Amino acid sequence: MSDLLTKDEIVALEKSYWDAMKEKDGARTAALSGETSIVSGPRGVMSIDQAKMGKMTEEGNWTLQDYAFDDVQVSTPAPGVAIIAYKVKQTVTMDGQQKQMEAADMSTWLRGKDGWQCHAHSETMLGGQPLV
């Protein structure tokens, strides 16, 4: 992949990350994450290093069964920078309970010595869903 990605390439990167979560593939989520990534969502804001990201993927008390993107928006403001925002419908099991959730997500990808990696991700729950 070059320093300027097409919309399809950016979507493919993001889906690769989601597929790794679905497969509980911590090595892949770690490799696709920046050395330290900033994540924001219903539980607040945190910085997560690659090792912790991999561990959270493998050991988290959740399972992602399915997901679908909608209303995808992308921007490549500079060489080696890609931003993607989208709505995502996801089916997850948390604490033994299956849930359907809809959120608005955004990720910032940077191309570095290890290829394209996600350095920031945010998730906002939609539809007045409980912040569990």
Listing of model-derived features with the role each one plays in the protein:
Residues 1-31, 38-132:
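A beta-strand edge to alpha-helix "cap/lid" segment located at domain peripheries
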